[in-house]
Amino acid sequence: MRLLFVLLLSSVVASADRPNVVLVMADDQGWGQTGYYNHPVLKTPHLDAMAAAGLRFDRFYAGGPVCSPTRATVLTGRSHDRTGVFDHGFALRSQEKTLARALQRAGYATGHFGKWHLNGLRGPGVPILKDDTHSPGKVGFDVWLSVTNFFERDPLLSRM
């Protein structure tokens, strides 16, 4: 009887739909910089709607002082001194074990959309192509629509 229960339970678990996994990451956003935390200036209607439905971003911590080390830390679970991504301009090594690769092994389709900033120094807004040696595809993303970085190093363009 116990074996039958285990078999039935495993078949139910195997047939259950897997949850979608979406990681939202914003550069240089403080914990109180959302509408649902009553920021006096910033408007975040989509985040506010998710918070009203029960999803609040209140347990996420940066792995480094700037975006590239933090991105590497999030993707690998390792500190930036272990990934070798110490600052802007350092590429994530393709041999790193990443969250994207783990999700692929579990049968998920993976994608990256937005700022990558883990492929070394490139000009702002440069698209990341399939043959880039440090593309999202090299660390476990099936598809991506990503650019190297945005205009944070140009005082004029960063305001546009």
Please provide the spans of the model-predicted regions.
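Sec-dependent N-terminal signal peptides
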Residues: L3-V13
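Formylglycine-dependent sulfatase
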Residues: S15-M160
